[in-house]
Each structure stands twice: as C-alpha cells, then as structure tokens.
Amino acid sequence: SHFSRRRNYSLVNNMKQKVRKGEELNEINLKIFLKENGLISKIKSDLGVLQFSNGFSNLTYQLNIEDKEYVIRKPPKGAVYGHDMGREYKVLKGLNNGFNKAPIVYAYADDNNIIGTPFYIMEKVNGRIITPRELKERTIPSKDYSTISTTRLNPQVALHNLDSHQLGLSERGTPAGYVERQVRNWGKQYLKAATDDIKEAELIMNWLNENQPKQYKHSLIHNDYKYDNVVFSSNSWTKINSILDWEMCTIGDPLMDLGTSIAYWAMASDPKGLKAAFDYPTSIEGNPTRLEIIKMYEKQTGEPVNNIVFYYVFGLFKIAVIVQQIYYRYDK
C-alpha cells in the first residue's frame, strides 16, 4: 500500500478541501470526545473540518477549533486489513517518549459509535515536504541537495539506534525470522496479484530466497522512509520537523529499511522507466548516488553495510509488487 499512500497525509503542502460526500464526521460526538480528552474547553465551539484531498489507505482530516489545529486519522468505513489505528497510535505514543521526529498523538478511540470507526488525534505538522508540486513552486538549488540528503538520513539512523524496550515498543514486531518472512510474504503477494507470466519475477523471487543474509540486526524501522514522508523546516534544510506515515513501523532488519529507501532513490543514470516511477528529486544534479547514501549510513552508524545488493533488490521487488497490485485492481 506504499503507492496508494504516496500523497497520503502530507500534512503540509497537501491540498485541503471540504469533506467528501459519504466521509463526513459526526461533529457533535467528536467535540464531546475532544472535550473529554482536554483538547477543547467548550462543546459549543465551532469545529472547522477540512479533509486532505489525497490519501486512500486512511482518511485524514484537519480540525480547526479554539485557535488550535489537530489532525484526525481514521480508516475508510468497512476497512479491516492494514488499517489498525490502535497499533499506529501505540507506535506513535511510544515514539513520543524518546524520538522527537514522530508526530505527537493526543488521544485514541476504538469505539465505533463516536464517528463510525476507530480513530486517533494527532498534532498538525507544519513545514516543507519535497514533492513535484513543491519543486514547481520553489526550485531548490543543486548545491542544497547535499545538505538535504544528509539531513534526511539523520532521523532514520536515529530510529535504528533507539531502544524499543525503553519506549515500550519491544512487542511491535517479531524480530526472529523477519527477513525470511518478508521475502516469503511479498512473494505470495506478487503471486496473488499476478496478471501475466513474467519470468523475471520468478527469477527474482528465487534469487531473494537464495541470497538472504544468515544473520542480521534488529531495530525499530519505519518501512516507508522516503521524501514525501519527511517534513523539513520551512526555514532550514538542516532541520526536520517530523517524519510521517508510521503505519508500517515494526521491529525488523534496519538494512531492509535502508534498502527500501535506496530503492526509491532514482538516479540520473537509471533507465527511464525507473526514473518515471519515482517523481522524487533524487535524480537532480547535486544529489548523492545510492552508493554515497550507503556510505553516509555506514559513517553515521559506525558499522559496515553488508549484502546491500540483496536489500536493494528486495526494495525494488517490494515496490514492483505494489505497482502490480495496483494494476491488478485496475485490470479487474
């Protein structure tokens, strides 16, 4: 579901609009909930609700009330798989205890009687997200990309160094067998969504099975760490205000996280198809190469990155499966 969320809750430069028909919130119930949780003082206050125009995996709204701005995240009605609001809230709540780049969460409700689905309330994140639209409005000088790419990497390294036990997140995943499960599960997902007989897909699945690392570290990982989930300060490329989209955060191999990130990192020398798939600024002159990103990661962690070809190929395969799933739904 990475691509279904590529413009999900970019809470900064995402277009906000009136709430779409059929996706309205029960404002009376919501205001009672906000007051009970100390987020507003009066139920009579006007609740200005806007909906973020993008986002298909989960629905995201902005609440403007009593000079405060909140964001509410909820799944679409009827959604089950991949929309665990409680898990996402607990991950963010834990991260709030020791990682200052995750959005602050204020309250969670698993009661369907309030607005029809479980939901949680989080802070409204401000700053700048580097998207194609943003680049059209404000060109970034080539000389800035070295700073930008270093700044972008810092929170990912910090996340991989966190102690999940101290944050109360040690049960957020099953570290043993993580790589094996990922390879197996993404292979299964591809086969379920296959529409054509693509021999290369079978070759890649076999290669991934045969080239898995025997040993690997475990840490908290984001699992979708890319430019449109990174909120920079509006005033400085050396500061990141927040990292978004934590619904796939788990405990796993940190190099899986890095591999997915560099899979999204298209370069000017890449084939046209690969560059067309990722409309990020990574191929613009001034950006480091994927190899340079890996070297930066090694320098920051103080540890060598081994078997990176496996992790990069897995990242590309995972993205290809997501594209195939989208095509499968379209083709039906």
Model-assigned labels for residue ranges:
Residues 244-249:
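Activation of the activation-loop gatekeeper triad in protein kinase-fold domains
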Residues 256-301, 315-331:
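Active-site activation/catalytic loop segments of kinase-like enzymes and analogous catalytic loops
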Residues 220-222, 227:
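Catalytic-loop of the protein kinase fold
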Residues 1-9, 15:
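N-terminal mitochondrial targeting presequences
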Residues 12-42:
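Juxta-kinase regulatory segment immediately upstream of eukaryotic protein kinase catalytic domains
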Residues 173-174, 304-315:
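All-alpha amphipathic helical-bundle segments outside canonical DNA-binding/catalytic cores
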Residues 47-203, 207, 211-220, 234-238:
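ATP-binding pocket architecture of kinase catalytic cores
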